[in-house]
């Protein structure tokens, strides 16, 4: 009897190969006047989140976390920040687990780094650092799946 594992069992199930800023844009359209307008006010700050996945090789995937943040005061943009933060992941998982891991676990691993970039960019732009609250990628995954099912139902 042997307890030897096959080589595929020895591999990590999820490996982070690299992380990087794929695209970053930050603007304060009304500067310097917008700094004065903002004082003592709380702008509305909607955050749009999306996750895209692409295959880059054998069991290797690029996961891109997209954040679009726009601070609005009386309908006017105070600042606009767009970030595409990406990572390349190698997965050694059963086929049925790959999609949820790519859209839930991988963005969850990328988020703290993207959150830090957002805080640094807003601070370096002369604003108070914007500290994003944790995101529920499971809920985002479910909402996306429901949306896709609804679209397929209409087709």
Curated annotation (Swiss-Prot):
It is found in: Cytoplasm. Pfam families: SecB. GO terms for biological process: protein folding; protein tetramerization; protein transport. One of its GO terms (molecular function) is unfolded protein binding. Keywords: Chaperone, Cytoplasm, Protein transport, Translocation, Transport. It comes from the Bacteria. The keyword Glycoprotein does not apply. Its main location: cytoplasm. GO terms for cellular component: cytoplasm. InterPro entries: SecB (IPR003708), SecB-like_sf (IPR035958). HAMAP family: SecB. Homotetramer, a dimer of dimers. One homotetramer interacts with 1 SecA dimer. Belongs to the SecB family. One of the proteins required for the normal export of preproteins out of the cell cytoplasm. It is a molecular chaperone that binds to a subset of precursor proteins, maintaining them in a translocation-competent state. It also specifically binds to its receptor SecA. This is Protein-export protein SecB. It comes from Paramagnetospirillum magneticum (strain ATCC 700264 / AMB-1). The gene is secB.
